[in-house]
């Protein structure tokens, strides 16, 4: 009798049955993948031992592409086809993309999300991000030696619904099952809190390549509660590069509009190196020759750089003050400030943070890796690999208010910002005119009072409202936000019971058909392999059928009449004629025809075998 193994819900019954899940930090500049191995989270390196994957994709002719370090090396020589900092474009229309003026790309003004024309066709940010995620997925599967059950992917806390949905779509294209979208500051807090057994109020200051987040968290006995979140999804280290880029050109008397795309990318790469050098030196030199022959030689001091980027530093402090205000705490209440993101290595940032909070920031964890490590811990837990010490709870928040448009273009907030998720809130509305039988529901996200100043997420209609006098109908609108921060909206007229709903998929220009097509395109090689396998299986079955038929005819051909034998021979010849071809359907059809055509022959052979076996035996011997 077999014994059933019984384990606690959510726990793996045995170590060898551990389900493999990873945490992925999909960054603007670099991306990482991490996993928990032997109860310790660690970042997974590539075959060369490098843990950082540059978030760069270069497109080549005929579907070729380069991803990561190899693509980054060619960014200056092939800037139009080498996409960098794509995270800044996720879920964004062309008008919303800041810094696009200095980007060397040919933008396509598609509805919703901006797209980029390359030598391999027009690419959306979702497709580009999917290439990066797929590369990390392959790295993880190679490192861990098996397929993944899923991944926790981090996003800036201030990403709105459109940007979050775009990230999930990219993961889907990359063949990843998303266990959770986790806010980056929260992931950092998990890694820091579990590593240091920290308790109290903490601020997570997260300045990446393209986004800024500030979260206030309360850590108490394994409970990670986000009290407030603020940020700017269009502010990051790239903006510091552009400030330095503009200064260098101004000093040289060069108009950025006159630069070739190759020179733009070359200069941006060089000023980034210059910026990083200024993190450890009082001054640094720039020496670069442009394609026009112009030779730029400049020395930039740290003081000059600090002066240039001071407005950007102040832009990070504005949402910081707002988050503290929302959490109803002061800088003096904060026990520690955790720095996240490569841009926080700049002394100008560390000095500003220390001055504002009145204490030096915590830097004992690598700011480039801490988010991925926290995501790996959460992924391991969600995959069911609960172990000793994993009794912790994560309470995250929604960063921007969700509301509905009311008469006059006003916004009625249903779920205020910094509400703990998952959450559901409802509010009742009524009709505006006598006899009104339908209501248009416009879902928006933002903090402003006017719809025009907020981001439109979705529209749908509730029809079938019974005709009544204005104000008599009662329409209950329910907003429901899941643990990923994604929204569903339901509307119900209370008297008649008519209802309508929408799962918000923001109109950033990527419909389900588009996603399906991308999936189809991305799996072309796999489909070709599957077709080849199906063809070979059909050929093998055809060969088996022909051999079996030939052997049967040789052994018992006398069981068939002349016309029956001719029919079997004809069916076998027909199968033999197509068996080595490449038409799988034709081979399968001919194989089935021969099988059906020899059914009676097989039955006669069976009868003959039975008679032979029973011949000369008495009934009581059987």
Curated annotation (Swiss-Prot):
Transmembrane segments: none
SUPFAM superfamilies documented for this protein: Actin-like ATPase domain, Heat shock protein 70kD (HSP70), C-terminal subdomain, Heat shock protein 70kD (HSP70), peptide-binding domain
A Pfam family hit: HSP70
BP terms from Gene Ontology: iron-sulfur cluster assembly
InterPro entries reported in the protein's UniProt record: ATPase_NBD, Heat_shock_70_CS, HscA_NBD, HSP70_C_sf, HSP70_peptide-bd_sf, Hsp_70_fam, ISC_FeS_clus_asmbl_HscA
UniProt keywords, alphabetically: ATP-binding, Chaperone, Nucleotide-binding
Listed GO MF terms: ATP binding; ATP hydrolysis activity; ATP-dependent protein folding chaperone; unfolded protein binding
Highest taxon, organism lineage: Bacteria
Function: Chaperone involved in the maturation of iron-sulfur cluster-containing proteins. Has a low intrinsic ATPase activity which is markedly stimulated by HscB.
Similarity remark: Belongs to the heat shock protein 70 family.
Name of the featured protein: Chaperone protein HscA homolog
């Amino acid at each position: 009798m077999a014994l059933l193994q019984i384990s606690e819900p959510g726990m793996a019954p045995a170590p060898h049955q551990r389900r493999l899940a990873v945490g992925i930090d999909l960054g603007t500049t670099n991306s990482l993948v991490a996993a928990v191995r032997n109860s310790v989270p660690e970042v997974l390196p590539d075959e060369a031992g490098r843990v950082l994957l540059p978030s760069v994709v270069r497109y080549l002719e005929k579907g070729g592409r380069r991803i990561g370090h190899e693509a980054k090396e060619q960014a200056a020589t092939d800037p139009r086809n080498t996409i960098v900092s794509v995270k800044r474009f996720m879920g964004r229309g062309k008008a919303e993309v800041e810094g696009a003026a200095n980007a060397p790309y040919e933008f396509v003004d598609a509805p919703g999300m901006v797209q980029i024309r390359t030598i391999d066709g027009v690419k959306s940010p979702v497709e580009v991000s999917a290439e990066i995620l797929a590369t990390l997925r392959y790295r993880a599967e190679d490192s861990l030696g098996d397929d993944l059950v899923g991944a926790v992917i981090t996003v800036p806390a201030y990403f709105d619904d459109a940007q979050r949905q775009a990230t999930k779509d990219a993961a889907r294209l990359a063949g990843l099952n998303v266990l959770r979208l986790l806010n980056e500051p929260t992931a950092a807090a998990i890694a820091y809190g579990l590593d240091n057994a920290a308790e109290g109020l903490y601020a997570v200051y997260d300045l990446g390549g393209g986004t800024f987040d500030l979260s206030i968290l309360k850590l108490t006995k394994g409970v990670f509660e986000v009290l407030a979140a603020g940020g700017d999804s269009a502010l990051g280290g790239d903006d510091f590069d552009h400030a330095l880029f503009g200064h260098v050109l101004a000093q040289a008397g060069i108009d950025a509009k006159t630069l070739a795309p190759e020179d733009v990318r070359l200069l941006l790469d060089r000023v980034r190196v210059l910026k990083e050098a200024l993190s450890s030196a009082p001054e640094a030199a720039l020496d670069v020759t442009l394609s026009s022959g112009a030779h730029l030689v400049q020395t930039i001091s740290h003081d000059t750089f600090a002066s240039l980027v001071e407005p950007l530093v102040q832009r990070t402090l504005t949402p910081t003050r707002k988050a503290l205000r929302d959490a109803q705490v002061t800088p003096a209440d904060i026990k520690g400030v955790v720095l996240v993101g490569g841009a926080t290595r700049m002394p100008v940032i560390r000095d500003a943070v220390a001055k504002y909070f009145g204490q030096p920031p915590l830097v004992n964890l690598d700011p480039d890796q801490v988010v991925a490590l926290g995501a790996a811990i959460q992924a391991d837990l969600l995959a069911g690999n609960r172990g000793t010490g994993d009794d912790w709870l994560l309470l995250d928040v929604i960063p921007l208010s969700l509301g509905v448009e009311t008469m006059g273009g006003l916004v009625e907030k249903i779920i205020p910002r910094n509400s703990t998720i998952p959450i559901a809130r409802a509010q009742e509305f009524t009709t505006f005119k006598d006899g009104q039988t339908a209501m248009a529901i416009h879902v928006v996200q933002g903090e402003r009072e006017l719809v025009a100043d907020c981001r439109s997420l979705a529209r749908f209609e509730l029809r079938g409202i019974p005709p009544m006098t204005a104000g008599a109908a009662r329409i209950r609108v329910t907003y429901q936000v899941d643990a990923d921060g994604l929204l569903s909206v339901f509307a119900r007229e209370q008297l008649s019971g008519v209802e309508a709903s929408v799962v918000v998929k923001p109109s950033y220009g990527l419909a389900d058909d588009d996603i399906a097509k991308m999936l189809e395109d991305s799996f072309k090689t796999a489909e070709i392999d599957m077709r080849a396998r199906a063809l070979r299986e059909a050929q093998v079955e055809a060969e088996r059928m022909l051999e079996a038929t030939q052997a049967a005819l040789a052994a018992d051909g006398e069981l068939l009449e002349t016309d029956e034998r001719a029919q079997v021979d004809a069916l076998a010849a027909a199968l033999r004629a197509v068996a080595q071809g490449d038409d799988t359907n034709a081979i399968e059809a001919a194989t089935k025809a021969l099988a059906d055509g020899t059914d009676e022959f097989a039955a006669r052979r069976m009868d003959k075998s039975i008679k032979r076996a029973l011949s000369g035996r008495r009934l009581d011997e059987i």
